Regions:
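Conserved beta-sheet core of the metallophosphoesterase superfamily
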Residues: 150-153, 276-335, 341-343
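Short acidic, glycine-rich surface-loop motifs adjacent to enzyme active sites
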Residues: 110-122, 158-159, 230-233, 254-273
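Binuclear metal-dependent hydrolase catalytic cores centered on His/Asp/Glu-rich metal-binding motifs
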Residues: 85-100, 134, 138, 198-263, ...
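A short C-terminal boundary segment appended to hydrolase-like catalytic domains
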Residues: 55-56, 65-69, 220-224, 273, ...
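Active-site neighborhood of phospho(di)ester-bond hydrolases with catalytic His/Asp-centered motifs
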Residues: 74-76, 112-118, 151-159, 184-188, ...
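Active-site-proximal segments of metal-dependent phosphoesterases and phosphodiesterases across multiple
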Residues: 124-147, 258-290
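N-terminal, intrinsically disordered, polar/charged segments of Gram-positive cell-envelope systems
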Residues: 35-69
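Active-site environment of divalent metal-dependent phosphoester hydrolases
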Residues: 81-83, 121-123, 159-171, 191-201, ...
Length: 425
């Protein structure tokens, strides 16, 4: 046996035995240090996922409105034919001229403007002298797009809407309003019925509302949606022929289901006090369920009345018109009806249905009956805003003129007798 080899092997084994524990200790220490770095990172990822899950669980609560506001302003006769057209052509503003003073009414405070369109809109041009001599009106199409920046709906129930029937003036008018997304209601003939027997007196029109929300708290957001409100509007042309009982009965079909506003065209021109026929028929409209009657035609402001607590305006007078010879013809009133509809399941369904209530002769009322909807609950504030068409431009009346107009309308007496408390029950 080689003693040198035996001794070398012994030394090698001794070295292995000596080094192995050291390797184990060093390796263990290194692994421990690695774990210190890696495990917290993995734990951190897990914790982050948990936090993300918690955040997802805390999605903001969507809050519905507690009520829907609808601030409306009604005006009298609107007309851009005859001399209004001449003034506009002479102005740098052209088609925008007749409406250039309307910003004095702070349009942004209202959801809807409604007026009487006292002229068919047609492509047939008639000069101002001929319109004046014949009292036959035709309003140029070009103004309609400008009107749409201000007005949401027009009544067509008046004594000039049939002036251009040889060129199908009523249809042209409706077509032009449709193109510009202006709603309309009423017919120059109350007795007209279509092939199905349906009248064209009343329509359900829909307006964008102003939603009213409760105080929004942390982790809550307002419902981001457009809420529409439907309102029944009826136009009656009573100048040459008074409405029949059947014509008037149409009001009840709508007033059972919706706030219903009547815009009759009646009375002796240039008178400041309503005649007995106006009183009889306008009061009858209230008896049939109308929530307000807002008249025009006389080209003058007439008295107002609270009948059974409800508003009757016998005539609003001119608004945008070309009669300039006396203050009587230049002055008018805007009627401010400020609604607040109380949100409940019934109103929610009405608002959803209202999307389909913007077209002429739609099936909105029939659909409401099918859904068994009832008249929404609402509160109503009423005010008069005097208007002034002097210097050939419609605008809000100054304080002195406004005082005279309100006195002529007997507004101080009327407003104390209005009572719309029934509407919220």
């Amino acid at each position: 046996m080689n003693h040198k080899s035996s001794k070398g092997i012994s030394n090698w084994l001794f070295a292995v035995i000596l080094i192995t524990p050291l390797i184990i200790v060093v390796g263990g220490f290194a692994f421990f240090q690695y774990q210190k770095r890696v495990v917290p990172a993995e734990t951190s990822k897990i914790e982050t996922k948990k936090e993300d899950a918690k955040i997802e669980e805390k999605k903001p609560e969507i809050i519905r409105p507690t009520s829907l506001g609808l601030n409306t302003l009604f005006f009298g006769d609107v007309f851009w034919g005859r001399y209004v057209d001449d003034w506009s052509k002479a102005s740098d503003l052209k088609f925008a001229y007749p409406f250039s003073g309307l910003n004095t009414f702070q349009r942004e405070n209202y959801q809807a403007w409604i007026a009487d369109l006292e002229c068919p809109i047609t492509s047939t041009y008639i000069n101002s002298a001929t319109q004046d001599n014949l009292l036959k009106f035709s309003c140029p199409v070009g103004y309609t797009a400008e009107a749409a920046k201000w007005f949401n709906a027009f009544t067509l129930a008046n004594n000039h809407m049939d002036n251009m029937q040889e060129v199908d003036g009523l249809k042209q008018t409706r077509d032009n309003l449709d193109v510009n997304k202006i709603q309309y209601f009423g017919h120059y003939d109350n007795s007209f019925r279509d092939a199905t027997g349906r009248d064209e007196i009343c329509e359900i029109v829909s307006f964008k509302s102003k939603p009213v929300f409760p105080e929004i708290k942390d982790n809550q957001i307002k419902m981001d949606s457009e809420f529409l409100i439907p309102v029944a509007m009826c136009g009656y042309h009573n100048v040459f022929k008074l409405p029949t009982e059947a014509d008037l009965a149409v009001i009840t079909e709508y007033s059972k289901y919706l706030p219903t506003i009547i815009m009759p065209h009646q009375g002796q021109e240039y008178k400041t006090v309503a005649d007995s026929l106006q009183e009889t028929y306008y009061r009858k409209m209230i008896d049939l369920g109308a929530d307000a009657v807002i008249g025009d035609h006389t080209h003058s402001v007439q008295n107002t009345e609270a009948y059974k607590g409800k508003l009757i305006v016998y005539s609003m007078g001119n608004f945008i018109f070309d009669q300039q010879t006396a203050p009587l013809y230049r002055q008018g009133i805007g009627v401010n009806l400020d609604f607040n509809f109380f949100m409940d399941e019934n109103l929610k369904k009405w608002s959803e249905l209202a999307v389909n209530c913007t077209g002429f002769k739609d099936n909105c009322l029939a659909e409401a009956k099918m859904q068994k909807l009832i008249k929404p609950k609402f509160s109503l504030k009423v005010d008069l805003i005097p208007t002034d068409n002097s210097n050939k431009l419609a605008k809000k009346a100054d304080e002195d003129v406004a005082t005279k107009i309100l006195k002529q309308a007997k507004w101080a007496e009327t407003k104390t007798k209005l009572d719309y408390s029934y509407a919220g029950k």
